[in-house]
Each structure stands twice: as structure tokens, then as C-alpha cells.
Swiss-Prot record:
It comes from Staphylococcus aureus (strain JH9). Heterodimer of HisH and HisF. Its EC number is 4.3.2.10. This is Imidazole glycerol phosphate synthase subunit HisF. InterPro entries: Aldolase_TIM, His_biosynth, HisF, IGPS_HisA/HisF, RibuloseP-bd_barrel. Pathway: Amino-acid biosynthesis; L-histidine biosynthesis; L-histidine from 5-phospho-alpha-D-ribose 1-diphosphate: step 5/9. Keywords: Amino-acid biosynthesis, Cytoplasm, Histidine biosynthesis, Lyase. One of its GO terms (biological process) is L-histidine biosynthetic process. It is an enzyme of class 4 (lyase). Coiled coil: none annotated. Pfam families: His_biosynth (PF00977). GO terms for cellular component: cytoplasm. It is found in: Cytoplasm. Its main location: cytoplasm.
């Protein structure tokens, strides 16, 4: 039995960790290196850094953050945000990232997934999907630019395409659930998992440990992402894991 993972997510803007609700209203959380070390020691299975900086200076700061963090971590580090090319991926991996997460650039140029997978191995390539449910069209669509722009690409079509192109993992954020702490989008995540064979990290809505139990009981996703509840110290990684174990679910 593959053990489930709990993964803290740190949105980094201009060298600081920030958090919003439904991708809006960002507030400062703290120093990314300090937080990464804290989560490493607190029992996190992996870490995700998403660089949401708008400037080149911000992206350069991110490389420093990755280098300082990676040398002190004993768990895998995935980095996403602003990645446009194979050179960008090379730079991130050389600075200490274990995996990279592609989003807008992959939607713009799907062949980047294949090129990256061929060059670095599919185990390094995670595709992040910001999924928005459009009630008028009654379908989930992929969004780009940090959730600000909706495309005409349907999520259920896209997940199958990226798997064929060589993605090794999916990071699916349900935008309507992000930061709301009301539970994961179970039905949506279960549908995606039925369409692909690669691991899925679920993001958006984890408000308490029971939400993670429901996630793992009702879907076959591999991991749950947590941000708000951990950053605000409402709970800890170990507390979440303990409740998951009590629910009879194998967790790392």
C-alpha cells in the first residue's frame, strides 16, 4: 500500500511567503527558508514552493531561497512559478529543486512537457492545474497567470494530454475551494484520478484533519496540500497525520 503524503505549500512573492483566499488578498506569512525548515522538522513529506513574483528581481530572489532551503532539507522540494523554458528548469534543479511544477507555460506550449520529461525524467515534472468551474458552461477549465485568466482548455481533457506528454505528477488546485477551509473538491478530484494513472496532489480546501481523511477515503489521490491551516498554526503536520492514521489510512 502506497502511503499518503502531507505537503505544505509556500507561495513566495519577492522573497516572502504570502497567502490569500481564492488567489486574492495576499498577506505576509514569513521567511520561506525559516518556514521550510520548520515544516521539514515538523514531519512534512515534501514541500512545494510556488514563485508568484512579478519581477525578474523577485525570480532571482527565489533562486537564492531555493539554494538556502535545499541545503537544509531532508525531504523533496518542488518549485513552480514563472518557468518558461528548459533553461529555467535546469537552473532550478541546479539550485536544489528536486522537481519542477509547470502551469501557464505548459498550457501555452504543451511540447515543453515532453521536452522536459525527455531531458530530466518524468519523475521531475509536475503539472500544476488551477481548475475553475464555469457554471454557465457547466465544466471545469484550466486557468493561467496565477488563476487570473481562464482558458478554453477543459481540465479533464488536459490531464489526459499531459500524462501522454510525459508528466510524472499532477498538482490540482480547485480554485473555488482555495483558502476556504471547507474541504476538498472530492468529486472533481475523483473524476481526474479516474482519467489518469500518475499521482495527484490535491490542493484547495483543506481546513482540518478530517478533510484529509475524507480526501483519502473518497479518492485515490496520493497527497494533500496544506497552506492556510499550517501557516496560521491552526494545526500541525503531525496532528493531521495522527487523525489520518486513526481513520485507518496509511500515511508516511
Amino acid at each position: 500500500m502506497i502511503k499518503k503524503r502531507i505537503i505544505p505549500c509556500l507561495d513566495v512573492k519577492d522573497g516572502r511567503v504570502v497567502k490569500g483566499i481564492q488567489f486574492k488578498g495576499l498577506r505576509d506569512i514569513g521567511n520561506p527558508v525559516d518556514l521550510a525548515i520548520y515544516y521539514n522538522e515538523a514531519g512534512a513529506d515534501e514541500l512545494v514552493f510556488l514563485d508568484i513574483s512579478k519581477t525578474e528581481e523577485g525570480h532571482s530572489l527565489m533562486l537564492e531561497v531555493i539554494e538556502q532551503t535545499a541545503s537544509r532539507l531532508f525531504i523533496p522540494l518542488t518549485v513552480g512559478g514563472g518557468i518558461q523554458s528548459l533553461d529555467d528548469i535546469t537552473q532550478l534543479l541546479n539550485h536544489g529543486a528536486d522537481k519542477v511544477s509547470l502551469n501557464s507555460s505548459a498550457l501555452k506550449n504543451p511540447q515543453l512537457i515532453k521536452q522536459a520529461s525527455d531531458k530530466f525524467g518524468r519523475q521531475c515534472i509536475c503539472i500544476a492545474i488551477d481548475s475553475y468551474y464555469d457554471p454557465e458552461r457547466k465544466a471545469h477549465y484550466c486557468c493561467t497567470h496565477g488563476g487570473k485568466k481562464m482558458t478554453n482548455i477543459k481540465v479533464y481533457d488536459w490531464v489526459q494530454q499531459v500524462e501522454q506528454l510525459g508528466a510524472g505528477e499532477l498538482l490540482v488546485t480547485s480554485m473555488g475551494h482555495d483558502g476556504m477551509k471547507q474541504g476538498f473538491d472530492i468529486e472533481h478530484l475523483a473524476k481526474i484520478k479516474s482519467l489518469v494513472n500518475i499521482p495527484i496532489i490535491a490542493s484547495g480546501g483543506g481546513g482540518n484533519a478530517q478533510h484529509f481523511v475524507e480526501l483519502f477515503n473518497q479518492t485515490d489521490v496520493s497527497a494533500g496540500l496544506a497552506a492556510s491551516i499550517l501557516h496560521d498554526r491552526e494545526t500541525t503536520v503531525q496532528s493531521i497525520k495522527e487523525v489520518i492514521r486513526q481513520g485507518g489510512i496509511a500515511v508516511r
